[in-house]
Amino acid sequence: EKKTVYVSVFNPAGPSVEELKGLYVESNGYVSIDAAKFHRKQEIGEIKFDIVDGLGFDNKVVRLGDPFAKTPYYDGLLLTSNYVAPVRGNKFPVLEYDFYSFQTGPVDVYTYMLPIFPLDNEHGSRYGVMVDNSPVYLPEAGAPYYSTLWIQSVLRNCRINKTTHFIDKPGKHTVKIYCGHPGMMLQKIVVDFGGLKKSYMGPESTRIN
C-alpha cells in the first residue's frame, strides 16, 4: 500500500546561500545568535568586551566590560528604567550581530544572561538591547536576592529577558547589545518571529558558515 508524506519546504529564489554566508538567518520562525560570534564591536575607554571560556550553556560567554570599570556615561540616558529613546551617535560601547529575516512585524528578542549580583549599591545589572534604530530597552541580568526570579535564574544558570521590537521589511538587520553596567555576561540572543519552541537551552545557532 502506498502512502504519501507531505513535507513543508521553504526555498526562496533569493538571496543565495553565498549571499547569506556569515549572517544569522531566520529559520523556522526564529534567529538564534551565538553571543561569542559577533560581527562588530566598539569598545570605549575602560569598557572592553571579553570572551570568557567555561561558562554558560555553550561553555563560552561574552563579558560586557570589566565589573570594576567605570559605568559609561550616556547623554540623556538613565540606567534606572526599562526603556529609553533611540540612542544617537557612535560613542557607546556596543556589540553588533547581523541577521537576515524573511518576515516583518513585531518580534521578541530574548537575551540569555548569566545571573549576577551587582558588586555594590552603586552598580546595577542593566544592559541595552536595540534592533536597527529602534528604542533601546534596558533589562537586568540580576534579580532581588531570594526572589522567585532569582531562584529560577540560578537553578537554570541563566536569566532570560524578553524585549519587543519591530522589523519593518525583510532583509538584513542588526541586533545591538550595549554595555550598561559593566560586568554583565551574555550567552545567547534569540529573535522570535513566532516560531520559537519552548526548550531549556534555546535553539542552536542559525548562522550560515
Segments and roles (model prediction):
Residues 1-209:
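Extracytoplasmic
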